[in-house]
Amino acid sequence: SRGLGDVYKRQYVDKTGLIEYTNSVLDTTDAYICNSRPRRFGKSYAANMLAAYYSKGADSEKMFSGLQISKEADFREHLNKYDVIHIDIQWFLANCEDVDNVVTLITDSVLSELREIYPDIFTWEVSRLPDALSIVREKTGQKFIIIIDEWDVLIRDAATNGKVQEAYINFLRGMFKGTEPTKYIQLAYLTGILPVKKEKTQSALNNFDEFTMLSASNLAPYIGFTEDEVEKLSKEYHQDFDKVKRWYDGYLLKDYQIYNPRAVVGVMLKGEFKSYWSETASYEAVTPLINMNYDGLKTAIIEMLSGANVKVDTATFKNDTVNIHSKDDVLTYMIHLGYLGYDQYTKTAFIPNEEIRQELTVAVESRSWNEMLMFQQESERLLDATLDMDGVMVGTQIEKIHNEYISVIQYHNENSLSSVLAIAYLSAMQYYFKPIRELPTGRGFADFVYIPKPEYKADYPALIVELKWNQNAQTAMQQIKNKKYPTAIENYTGDILLVGISYDKNCKEHQCLIEKYEKES
């Protein structure tokens, strides 16, 4: 537990509710946890916190006093009471000269520490870690808490090395599989980016409960920052919460809006609204993924860049980086990497926030997609026509974009019209934040509201857009006025355009009316 006191030197947010959960499952069949999250989400922080709380080698009561866990009845019952084996696979991989020997290095390192702690127990040579843990349990009655950080790094970084994977899977199987491990394991906590691999590692770890970016269940609020936590931080550090939300919000885990902690801490300390993602990860990591030649992949990326949600079947992804065979596999992997958010109720993927939108835009532009370049040109013409208040041209451009680029979306109702419109205004993403869908107003919900980024506010008005399917544009405009939609952004000080768009299924024409909103003096 050396150095674990550093964990709480800058305690931004209390995440000790995770300890409350792990205490509740100790020494049960639910005590096998695999908690996967993207980089920069505080996975190692959580692992260090658990080690600091449980480890006999730590004296951490003062560290946890005043935090949520200290108020629980069983706080002292488990505090610093266990032998904790804390393995950082990334560290071992980085410090192993030959990756083929990394599993041996892990085993030898842990065995060496066990011999130091229990010199009288190991009177003969023990070469397998599970055997050593069983001996300690038999001689002392002591069970272990095993924490493995970056558990999946050998699955990701050594994906093509079958020898290493086989050795590692056998190591995991020996540690966790069967009845013998239940005799020496009090808690097993694995954390990484990927969930358990569906083919090879599943047989070794199928007794683990999984908490992922697809389904975080009870652990949703404990990795990443919740909206309430970020709002509290924004007040404490005098930051504009709405702006923080636009830039860094967007991950949906269970019923929580989750923020990337790395980005939130960065903006609180530095006061700069920018992509902190690029400081610790290059867009080059995602570029090969979005350029894979799978039907519908580039279209899906373009749709999401424009603010739309895209259906994704997450069941086909094998949870490794080698067996990617479809658009859905790519999108699911991007969800686990944090480049996409996921709504488990609608089973759709989306770009979560402005920070990630910038990263993906750079990744797309780095390869100069022909599809993207041509589409952007048409979208720019649509935006220019909107700003020029040329309703006829807007109708013509929407029709052209629908017919030539996104005809796969057939008009059946207002929802399908809104999907086409969101994609058609893709070029607006350079100047505007992600459109707000169905923004609550005085007497209803506006279909779309586009708010310009601060640096473009002088030249680009806010847009309030109402859609009508199989009605006329005048009806859409009248609804904007009757239901007082502009009151939803009445504190916005720039210009506002009201945009009514309709589609007539009989004549198959788009109509558009645009008016400038005159604020009441």
Positions of predicted regions on the chain:
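Walker A/P-loop nucleotide-binding motif
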Residues: 32-47
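Short, small-residue-biased leader/transition segments that mark boundaries at the very start
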Residues: 2-8
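Amphipathic alpha-helical segments of the small helical/lid subdomains adjacent to P-loop NTPase cores
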Residues: 200-206, 211-267, 300-301
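Flexible phosphate/Mg2+-sensing switch loops adjacent to catalytic phosphate-binding sites
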Residues: 53-80, 125, 437-439
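Substrate-engagement module of ASCE P-loop NTPases
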Residues: 135-137, 166-188, 488
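Pre-Walker A adenine-sensing motif
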Residues: 16-26
